Amino acid sequence: MRPSNREHDQLRPVTITRNFTNYAEGSVLVEFGQTKVICNASIVEGVPRFLKGKNQGWITAEYGMLPRATHSRTEREASKGKQGGRTLEIQRLIGRSLRACIDLKVLGENTITLDCDVIQADGGTRTAAITGSCVAMRDAIHWMVQREKIKKMPAFNYVAAVSVGIYRGQPVLDLDYAEDVLAETDMNVVMNEQGHFIEVQGTAEDNSFNREQLNSMLSLAEIGIPQLIEIQKNA
């Protein structure tokens, strides 16, 4: 039995609230159960130096957690003077995932920056950030079209992410914190609406996992992610 009494293939309740803040070109509050993340998409003119003159855009991300997003206060990384390895890894994952949504050439020499701020963490913050940021980014691109910064709305490929793992010997979908801390295996899966994989990150925590368990976890992701994409489209 899972701590939340969910079935092994059941997501937590997921909600996506668009236009959550007033100033960002795209803004979303995404909630996976008790995990809550604000995802703001900002349009910035210009691209990184390595893309100058190539007539294409860029998508990047920043990620952070509020000090009391967790059970006890965590010191802000800004006060330490540097970002931790986990933060950098998550930022890169979010950026890679969202660059799979569109052809970067349609953005011109503009950058979309996704700021993902975790206001409450109960497991799966990075997967929630990817899922919410996809919607915020689509709204930001629509803003660009309205202001004639680009000619038309480009083809957009929705991307979502979910965690899967082995909890007490059983593959489960969308781990919360109570499961995550005891999981024998923890994996994050990113997929698009065609059912293609964008990224798979998996780590054995206490015990190794076999091919059958890996297949079971990927099958759970294939159950959960289409549901998340449907929620994105209906937000």
Curated annotation (Swiss-Prot):
EC assignment: 2.7.7.56
GO terms of biological process kind: rRNA catabolic process; rRNA processing; tRNA processing
One function term, GO molecular function aspect: tRNA nucleotidyltransferase activity
Pfam families, per database record: RNase_PH (PF01138), RNase_PH_C (PF03725)
Top-level lineage group: Bacteria
Keywords of the record: Nucleotidyltransferase, RNA-binding, rRNA processing, Transferase, tRNA processing, tRNA-binding
Positions of phosphate binding: R86, G124, T125, R126
Family annotation (Gene3D superfamilies): GHMP Kinase, N-terminal domain
InterPro entries for the chain: ExoRNase_PH_dom1, ExoRNase_PH_dom2, ExoRNase_PH_dom2_sf, PNPase/RNase_PH_dom_sf, Ribosomal_Su5_D2-typ_SF, RNase_PH, RNase_PH_bac-type, RNase_PH_CS
Enzyme class: transferase
Catalysed reaction equations from the record: tRNA(n+1) + phosphate = tRNA(n) + a ribonucleoside 5'-diphosphate
Family named by the database record: Belongs to the RNase PH family.
Alphabetical list of HAMAP family matching this protein: RNase_PH
Protein task: Phosphorolytic 3'-5' exoribonuclease that plays an important role in tRNA 3'-end maturation. Removes nucleotide residues following the 3'-CCA terminus of tRNAs; can also add nucleotides to the ends of RNA molecules by using nucleoside diphosphates as substrates, but this may not be physiologically important. Probably plays a role in initiation of 16S rRNA degradation (leading to ribosome degradation) during starvation.
Subunit note: Homohexameric ring arranged as a trimer of dimers.
Protein name per UniProt: Ribonuclease PH
Organism expressing this protein natively: Legionella pneumophila subsp. pneumophila (strain Philadelphia 1 / ATCC 33152 / DSM 7513)
